[in-house]
From Swiss-Prot:
This is NAD(P)H-quinone oxidoreductase subunit 6, chloroplastic. NDH shuttles electrons from NAD(P)H:plastoquinone, via FMN and iron-sulfur (Fe-S) centers, to quinones in the photosynthetic chain and possibly in a chloroplast respiratory chain. The immediate electron acceptor for the enzyme in this species is believed to be plastoquinone. Couples the redox reaction to proton translocation, and thus conserves the redox energy in a proton gradient. GO terms for molecular function: NADH dehydrogenase (ubiquinone) activity; quinone binding. One of its GO terms (cellular component) is chloroplast thylakoid membrane. It catalyses: a plastoquinone + NADH + (n+1) H(+)(in) = a plastoquinol + NAD(+) + n H(+)(out); a plastoquinone + NADPH + (n+1) H(+)(in) = a plastoquinol + NADP(+) + n H(+)(out). The lineage of its organism: Eukaryota, Viridiplantae, Streptophyta, Embryophyta, Tracheophyta. It is found in: Plastid, Chloroplast thylakoid membrane. Pfam families: Oxidored_q3 (PF00499). Its EC number is 7.1.1.-. NDH is composed of at least 16 different subunits, 5 of which are encoded in the nucleus. Belongs to the complex I subunit 6 family. Keywords: Chloroplast, Membrane, NAD, NADP, Plastid, Plastoquinone, Quinone, Thylakoid, Translocase, Transmembrane, Transmembrane helix, Transport.
Length: 176
């Protein structure tokens, strides 16, 4: 969006704080329904951040796919679960939980150190140069397709593997 600087900065800080509060709500709220609604709030804030970044197609896809389908599916799944078996085991801390938290913390700190050590100056100029060159050549959807099949092929495939693992995990949990 073409907003004046202070308004853009205010909206950015407001949506960022909404993301933080919503993310804490997802993790810390004991009721799974409230956590699912908090996740919906986080996904709407992410969509609004995409609108601020002039990525209207990605914002619409975020709203339709994640908020409209995935979050509603999560809410329905939580509402139909037998809640008595899930609320009794919340206070147990197992070895798997400790290992999982250790791995996640290690990944978080390695990601933060990688982000801080990377020189982003050349990346920003390359992105702007590509945007200027591709602005007149093809439409936005064609640009997204060409970037997914060339520049972002590896992250796209990694996301598909993560989704496959999540699907297998959901099926194994549902079978138990």
């Amino acid at each position: 969006m073409d907003l004046p600087g202070p308004i853009h900065d205010f909206l950015l800080v407001f949506l960022g704080s909404g993301l933080i509060v919503g993310g804490l709500g997802v993790v810390l709220l004991p009721n799974p329904i409230f956590s699912a609604f908090s996740l919906g709030f986080v996904l709407v804030c992410i969509s609004l951040l995409y609108i601020l970044a002039n990525s209207h197609f990605v914002a619409a896809a975020q709203l339709l796919i994640y908020v409209g389908a995935i979050n509603v599916l999560i809410i329905f799944a939580v509402m139909f679960m037998n809640d008595s078996e899930y609320f009794t085991d919340f206070n147990l801390w197992t070895v798997g939980d400790g290992i999982t938290s250790l791995v996640c913390t290690t990944l978080l700190f390695s990601l933060i150190s990688t982000i801080l050590d990377t020189s982003w100056y050349g990346v920003i100029w390359t992105t702007r140069l590509n945007q200027i060159l591709e602005q007149d050549l093809i439409s936005n959807s064609q640009q997204i397709g060409s970037h997914l099949s060339t520049d972002f092929f590896l992250p796209f495939e990694l996301i598909s593997i993560i989704l496959l693992v999540a699907l297998i995990g959901a099926i194994s949990v549902a079978r138990q």
